[in-house]
A protein has these predicted regions:
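Short secondary-structure boundary segments
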Residues: 8, 40-41, 111-113
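Short, active-site-adjacent cap segments at secondary-structure transitions
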Residues: 11-12, 44-45, 115-117
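PIN-domain endoribonuclease scaffold, especially VapC-family toxins
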Residues: 28-83
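Short, well-structured N-terminal submotif of metal-dependent ribonuclease cores
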Residues: 1-38
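Acidic, PIN/NYN-like endoribonuclease modules and their adjacent C-terminal/linker elements
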Residues: 94-97, 101-139
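Mid-chain, well-packed structural core segment of small domains
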Residues: 73-108
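Short, flexible helix/strand-to-coil boundary loops that buttress conserved ligand/catalytic motifs
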Residues: 15-16, 50, 120, 137
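Residues at secondary-structure transition points
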Residues: 20, 37, 59-62, 87-94
């Protein structure tokens, strides 16, 4: 089964609109059509961003906790250890690359290709949600 990492901006976009590729990607995750790869660090980032945006999303903190619990159940959790020297343009995105390397997931989906493009040098594909959706929709 395909395993991939979702940048926080994809999770947020999936909750802001039920019409885009990000929303469809999360629907397919819920149906078990692919596996999300998570680390504790990434899950905490999801939580921080979603709780900060909870009023805009029409969610309470309890709603966010329930949502993240459901996502966690559809994910493979991988523990990350000591940080390495940053290799990406935005050091805040470094845990995504480290997670991909540690988990064997070869795909990161994000709305911010520019910061993650150097991941390709490490054998990690970085795709926009619409491109990832095409992959997981193929028969």
């Amino acid at each position: 089964m395909l395993r991939a990492i979702l940048d926080t901006n994809v999770i947020l976009a999936s909750l802001l609109s039920n019409r885009g590729a990000s929303f469809e990607i999360l629907q397919k995750l819920r149906r078990g059509e692919w596996r999300l790869v998570l680390s504790n660090h990434l899950l905490l980032e999801y939580e921080e961003v979603l709780k900060r945006n909870a009023p805009t999303l029409g969610m309470t903190f309890d709603d966010v906790d329930r949502y993240l619990n459901a996502i966690s159940k559809a994910a493979d959790c991988v523990e990350l250890f000591a940080p390495q020297t940053p290799r990406l343009l935005d050091p805040d995105d470094e845990p995504l690359l480290r997670l991909a390397e540690a988990s064997g997931a070869r795909l990161i989906t994000t709305h911010n290709l520019r910061h993650l493009r150097p991941a390709a040098a490490h054998g990690i594909a970085v795709l926009l949600p619409r491109d990832f959706l095409r992959i997981i929709t193929q028969p």
